[in-house]
Design a protein with these regions (language model features):
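Hydrophobic alpha-helical transmembrane segments of membrane proteins
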Residues: 1-61, 70-208
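Catalytic-core elements of nucleic-acid end-processing and repair enzymes
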Residues: 66
Length: 208
């Protein structure tokens, strides 16, 4: 919880305070600014560039090689924990930073649903698009750069937070995100080659 709280404080709330000093329209729309930056940096960027599929820590190594948990169950367990903690923690944290409870709940729900979509894209890249997978660092760097530019650059360039930018808390988008999340979880549940992915993760871990 503390790590997520500090993340929102440093990368979202502090930039908002900086922008608010020079832009009255941003200052007067604090909730919109926090929502927009969170969506770009956490929901989009975090899901695409910071997926857990190939990030194998010591705990995962012990679970698979020592405790003999299957790579399939290990990955799905990690994903389930991440989705639930994101939903619960971010709902609380966004509310603490001045976002209404309803909007905090909706954005956290959207974020939870987009997480498995990011993992599904990583699986598709690993399985079907080797050129993109082999250049994943460049892909991740591009996603991060674009997300940062949109999150910080758009409000500074426009000197306001447009209500049109908050489409992601509209009920229609939330329902669409739910369908995307369900489809992604089904795809990940049915995917047969987690052992192959785990071998690649072990190779990356040895290189590091």
């Amino acid at each position: 919880f503390i790590k997520k709280y500090l993340y929102v404080a440093v990368f979202i709330y502090v930039p908002y305070l900086f922008m608010a000093q020079f832009n009255p329209l941003i200052r007067d729309h604090k909730e919109s600014a926090v929502l927009f930056m969170f969506f770009m940096l956490s929901t989009i960027c975090g899901s695409l560039a910071n997926n857990t599929l190939l990030a194998m820590g010591d705990r995962d190594y012990l679970m698979v090689r020592v405790v003999l948990v299957s790579p399939y169950m290990n990955f799905l367990g990690r994903l389930a924990v991440k989705m639930v903690t994101d939903f619960v923690y971010f709902t609380i944290i966004l509310n603490l930073f001045g976002v209404s409870f309803v909007h905090s709940l909706l954005l956290s729900l959207v974020t939870m649903c987009i997480r498995p979509a990011g993992e599904m894209i990583a699986v598709l890249c690993f399985d079907q698009m080797q050129s993109m997978y082999n250049n994943r660092n460049a892909f991740n760097g591009t996603v991060i750069a674009l997300s940062v530019f949109v999150a910080y650059g758009m409000p500074l360039l426009k000197r306001q937070i447009s209500s049109d930018w908050l489409f992601f808390i509209h009920p229609v988008f939330v329902v669409a995100a739910l369908f995307i999340g369900v489809f992604s979880v089904y795809y990940l549940w049915d995917y047969p080659s987690y052992r192959k992915i785990m071998q690649e993760a072990l190779h990356i871990k040895r290189e590091v």
